[in-house]
Amino acid sequence: TGKKPSNINLLVDKDANRPKILRALKLWLPKVGGENRDIYLFFAGHGLASDDGKNLYILPQDGDASLLEDTAIKRSEIVKLLQKTNPKSVTMFFDTCYSGQTRNEETLVANLRPVRIVADEQNMPNNFTVFTASANDQTSGSINEAKQGMFSYYLMKGLEGKADENKDKQITNHEMIAYLKTNVSKEAFMQNREQDPMLSGDPDQVLMKY
């Protein structure tokens, strides 16, 4: 089902900076979200992990990869801010990776050391679902012809109905991750690399009806 435009906060390009993202989470969302609502969050961009691998960050448009704590946003902070709204459910989509590389497999930080990521998705609250573009040690690639991330491209296709395996006019988390794994992994293989989308959450939960 569609969402009211007034209930959507779209931040792209230069608007996807740290102050505006935090403003949306801290000020805008509590006003429109309210208690017992379903919240959906989508982020496409760079991500990095802390040196000890315990904290995952998203890197806003104005972020500095060498100053994570000062200019990036912790995923755990995002979760806490979303929890404060007392939502019925939260579904998050992250088209990013935490390997320290760009979609073209260039290094975000000079002389970056390999980091073993130990952050645990299972620590998420029970009413949270998280779809991620790749495993923590993989790079999230793109489809050049579509000019967007591979995960984002197939996520949109899936939401259009292609992920509805049993054709019952609703898509479960299981159906979506199965569709993403099949298509993203196949597309990545054609680029001579590995990318496996991941799901943390209830696989039987209905993601959407149409």
What positions do the PLM features span?
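Short, solvent-exposed loop/turn elements at domain surfaces
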Residues: R18, L67, F131, Q138-S142, ...
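Caspase-like (clan CD) cysteine peptidase catalytic core
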Residues: P19-A44, L48-T107
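Short glycine/serine- and small hydrophobic-enriched flexible loop segments
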Residues: M156-G161
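Short beta->alpha junction loops
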Residues: I8-R18
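Caspase-like cysteine protease fold
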Residues: A163-Y210
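Signal peptide-proximal N-terminal region
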Residues: T1-S6
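Extracellular S/T/G-rich loop segment that most often corresponds to the catalytic His/Ser-adjacent loop
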Residues: V90-Y153
